[in-house]
Curated annotation (Swiss-Prot):
This is Protein Vpr. It comes from Human immunodeficiency virus type 1 group M subtype C (isolate ETH2220) (HIV-1). Phosphorylated on several residues by host. These phosphorylations regulate VPR activity for the nuclear import of the HIV-1 pre-integration complex. GO terms for cellular component: host cell; host cell nucleus; host extracellular space; virion component. It holds the Pfam family VPR. The gene is vpr. Gene3D superfamilies: 6.10.210.10, VpR/VpX protein, C-terminal domain (1.20.5.90). During virus replication, may deplete host UNG protein, and incude G2-M cell cycle arrest. Acts by targeting specific host proteins for degradation by the 26S proteasome, through association with the cellular CUL4A-DDB1 E3 ligase complex by direct interaction with host VPRPB/DCAF-1. Cell cycle arrest reportedly occurs within hours of infection and is not blocked by antiviral agents, suggesting that it is initiated by the VPR carried into the virion. Additionally, VPR induces apoptosis in a cell cycle dependent manner suggesting that these two effects are mechanistically linked. During virus entry, plays a role in the transport of the viral pre-integration (PIC) complex to the host nucleus. This function is crucial for viral infection of non-dividing macrophages. May act directly at the nuclear pore complex, by binding nucleoporins phenylalanine-glycine (FG)-repeat regions. One of its GO terms (biological process) is symbiont-mediated arrest of host cell cycle during G2/M transition. The lineage of its organism: Viruses, Riboviria, Pararnavirae, Artverviricota, Revtraviricetes.
Length: 96
């Protein structure tokens, strides 16, 4: 009868450690792009909704990732990533 192979790969860091490190990196990046009162209110909302639980940590990570993605996609002034809105010439002349 076949047996499942033993885990011989490299040790992975625990999920909790990884989640906390990811949350810290996201918070540091979010502070550069969003007003602190917004982020504080988001944290308060998550805390009031989930309490001090891992579900709250996961919800905050997910929300910050979505906010950062949309922020960069729309076009962050600090980044070259995003939608570039070109100005149109008023006389109808093309820029090509």
């Amino acid at each position: 009868m076949e047996q499942a192979p033993e885990d011989q790969g490299p040790q992975r860091e625990p999920y909790n450690e990884w989640a906390l490190e990811l949350l810290e990196e996201l918070k540091q990046e979010a502070v550069r792009h969003f007003p602190r009162p917004w982020l504080h209110n988001l944290g308060q909302y998550i805390y009031e909704t989930y309490g001090d639980t891992w579900s709250g940590v996961e919800a905050l990570i997910r929300t910050l990732q979505q906010l950062m993605f949309i922020h960069f996609r729309i076009g962050c002034q600090h980044s070259r990533i995003g939608i570039l809105r070109q100005r149109r010439a008023r006389n109808g002349a093309s820029r090509s």
